[in-house]
Swiss-Prot record:
Family per record: Belongs to the bacterial ribosomal protein bL34 family.
Bias type Polar residues, positions: 1-10
Source organism: Shewanella loihica (strain ATCC BAA-1088 / PV-4)
Keyword field contains Methyltransferase: no
Basic residues bias spans: 11-20
GO terms of biological process kind: translation
UniProt keyword annotations, A-Z: Ribonucleoprotein, Ribosomal protein
Region described as Disordered: 1-21
Origin superkingdom: Bacteria
This protein's name: Large ribosomal subunit protein bL34
Length: 45
């Protein structure tokens, strides 16, 4: 039997998908901009 691949960690989640992580790169800023334009309630993790 194989182990479950999803091992949740809030720290890892924030570091890779958080708002500050998004704003650190050009691509991430584009992600935030797209989500703002779409009207998402949550912009990032």
């Amino acid at each position: 039997m194989s182990k479950r691949t999803f091992q949740p960690s809030n720290l890892k989640r924030k570091r890779s998908h958080g708002f500050r992580a998004r704003m650190a790169t050009v691509g991430g800023r584009k992600v935030i901009a797209r989500r703002r334009a779409k009207g998402r309630a949550r912009l990032s993790a």
